[in-house]
Curated annotation (Swiss-Prot):
UniProt xrefs under PANTHER family: EFFLUX SYSTEM COMPONENT YKNX-RELATED (PTHR32347), UPF0194 MEMBRANE PROTEIN YBHG (PTHR32347:SF29)
Name by which UniProt lists this protein: UPF0194 membrane protein YbhG
UniProtKB keywords: Coiled coil, Periplasm, Signal
Similarity remark: Belongs to the UPF0194 family.
InterPro entries: CusB_D23 (IPR032317), UPF0194_membrane_YbhG (IPR022936), UPF0194_transport (IPR050465)
Matches recorded under NCBIfam families: PRK03598.1 (NF002939)
Subcellular location: Periplasm
Length: 332
């Protein structure tokens, strides 16, 4: 009969030990697990045309989901198409001029220049002889000083024409100067740059979505004349999804880049999202008011960016999130 109370006593002791051990294990797990509070990062971007013009069409409205590469709107293309045609013509002219400079002068052009020199030489010889005769007549007082001056002027003009023809023939025979060829090449490159700019302007008269997102606001309507850079849409970026949280200096060593964490929301308290710390701010700041940790309000903390690896549409920007550290986060 004495054995029964002993057995019961042993059972009670064992049960108490199990309960105490379980409580100790639970407490140790809780103490080792760091909990932070943050929000799904709000990331928006203002979309605009890089060039100005009249809005021709807009393909999306507020609330629409957009995909990267999707056409969102277009300006009137006509002014940019005309500018492109002008730029192409400018390249053609500059290319032809450059090719002429490289090719040099033809034999026919050299022969014509030589003939021009011969003709200019004859004209100069005649003018020089005439001036010489006029000098003799002026000395004998047969002509006036004005007549002599006219003869001298004709001689000087014929001499200038001869020199110009000789210089031209010399240039034709030696080919174009390197400086002239370089100038023609520079003109061609300038025309090509203007063509590239015209092509880019035409391309930028179509507004393309840079990434996936949701359209928050549509600031203009078709027919609006915009200056370059004027906001057309405001888009909320949906990928990747980031959580912004803050950690105090005491726990900073636990929040290392690459560390895996669990993310809980009020709508999914029993089914966490998975995340990985991607960035830890190198500078401290005071805890923002949006962080729901009253005991840390006046503490200096470090901002974390946590990338959600299994995000879905249920995670909305600005949503409060609980960040759980611990062994279970690192092994799931």
């Amino acid at each position: 009969m004495m054995k029964k109370p002993v057995v019961i006593g042993l059972a009670v002791v064992v049960l108490a030990a199990v309960v105490a051990g379980g409580y100790w294990w639970y407490q140790s797990r809780q103490d080792n697990g760091l909990t932070l509070y943050g929000n799904v990062d709000i990331r928006t971007v203002n979309l605009s045309f890089r060039v100005g013009g009249r809005v021709e069409s807009l393909a999306v409205d507020e609330g629409d989901a957009i995909k990267a590469g999707q056409v969102l709107g277009e300006l009137d293309h006509n002014p940019y198409e005309i500018a492109l045609m002008q730029a192409k013509a400018g390249v053609s002219v500059a290319q032809a001029q450059y090719d002429l400079m490289l090719a040099g002068y033809r034999d026919e052009e050299i022969a014509q220049a030589a003939a021009a020199v011969k003709q200019a030489q004859a004209a100069y010889d005649y003018a020089q002889n005439f001036y010489n005769r006029q000098q003799g007549l002026w000395k004998s007082r047969t002509i006036s000083a004005n007549d002599l001056e006219n003869a001298r002027s004709s001689r000087d003009q014929a001499q200038a024409t001869l020199k110009s023809a000789q210089d031209k023939l010399r240039q034709y025979r030696s080919g174009n100067r390197e400086q002239d060829i370089a100038q023609a090449k520079a003109s061609l490159e300038q025309a090509q740059a203007q063509l590239a700019q015209a092509e880019l302007n035409l391309q930028d008269s179509t507004l393309i979505a840079p990434s996936d997102g949701t359209l928050l606001t549509r600031a203009v309507e078709p027919g609006t004349v915009l200056n370059e850079g004027g906001t057309v849409f405001t888009v909320s970026l949906t990928r990747p999804v980031w959580v912004r949280a803050y950690v105090d200096e005491r726990n900073l060593d636990q929040a290392q880049p690459g560390r895996k964490v669990l993310l809980y929301t009020d709508g999914r308290p029993n089914k966490p999202y998975h995340g990985q710390i991607g960035f830890v701010s190198p500078t401290a700041e005071f805890t923002p008011k949006t962080v729901e940790t009253p005991d840390l309000r006046t503490d200096l903390v470090y901002r974390l960016r946590i990338v959600v690896t299994d995000a879905d549409d249920a995670l909305r920007q600005g949503m409060p999130v609980t960040v759980q550290f611990g062994d279970e986060a690192g092994h799931e």
